[in-house]
Amino acid sequence: MADLDDIKDGKDFHTDKPQTNTLFALKGCGALDWGMQSRLARIFNPKTRKTVMLAFDHGYFQGPTTGLERIDINIAPLFEYADVLMCTRGILRSVVPPAINKPVVLRASGANSILTELSNEAVAVAMDDAVRLNSCAAAAQVYIGSEHEHQSIKNIIQLIDAGLRVGMPIMAVTGVGKDMARDQRYFSLATRIAAEMGAQIIKTYYVDKGFERIAAGCPVPIVIAGGKKLLEREALEMCYQAIDQGASGVDMGRNIFQSEDPVAMIKAVHAVVHHNETAERAYELFLSEKG
């Protein structure tokens, strides 16, 4: 039985002050459950509402591509500088130290390779395994306009439904159908469809003309893919323009880990995303940090 002899009656209830609720003001997340908002708050810095994701999931269809031959040697030194790690469960379990304590966006689609039709994907991770791995989100490709468009949308819907049951955000990644142009109209279509299906984050490509319309027409946060390797100055300019036009962050791989100095590059990207540095100033930072 509890000892009640020394219990004191509470008196300081501040009855003159109504309870306040602190909102996490991330685009499109106001109606989400607490657990999902909590995961999103680990992905997106609550102060800047931006993120720098380090993508090294390419091996799920490309194999050991340049820069990813040895994750433990080439990629692990970058972990501490990233806000979020994006990888497959195989790499997460075999290479990523649990003590690194970084939020993970788990690649959850697969079953294809560069030798076959890329859009022919399936859900490759059960949601209970994503939870078991303490993931903060799961990601899958959606191929609007491709041969397997219907299946890729079904994959996203399946993951979204499973994610809602456990409070797991889903990031839809817009793969490009082979007959579709990489322009504002296509990415406005693809990002909006994925958001309408219920994805909480969209990963897409930056385009020079009309990106602000893509971002404005998407009701949830957009992060841009790095895409093919660019010169460092060009990659930083792309980052700056995307953030300036409404992106909520970047999910970069090759433009970081294939850089002349990956650590210096991710620091420069961080400066653009979280501190609103121009591409020019970020490039100066890259040069000063370069080993």
Swiss-Prot record:
Subcellular location: Cytoplasm
Pfam families the record matches: DeoC
Keyword set includes Transferase: yes
GO cellular component terms, A-Z: cytoplasm
Upper lineage: Bacteria, Pseudomonadati, Pseudomonadota, Gammaproteobacteria, Enterobacterales
NCBIfam families: PRK08227.1
Active site: 203 (schiff-base intermediate with substrate)
EC number: 2.3.1.245
Alphabetical list of InterPro entries matching this protein: Aldolase_TIM, DeoC/FbaB/LacD_aldolase, DeoC/FbaB_aldolase, FbaB-like, LsrF
Gene3D superfamilies reported for this sequence: Aldolase class I
An MF annotation (GO) of this entry: acyltransferase activity, transferring groups other than amino-acyl groups
Name under which the protein is recorded: 3-hydroxy-5-phosphonooxypentane-2,4-dione thiolase
Family stated for the protein in its record: Belongs to the DeoC/FbaB aldolase family.
Biological function: Involved in the degradation of phospho-AI-2, thereby terminating induction of the lsr operon and closing the AI-2 signaling cycle. Catalyzes the transfer of an acetyl moiety from 3-hydroxy-5-phosphonooxypentane-2,4-dione to CoA to form glycerone phosphate and acetyl-CoA.
Assembly notes: Homodecamer.
Keyword terms, alphabetized: Cytoplasm, Schiff base, Transferase
Highest taxon in the source lineage: Bacteria
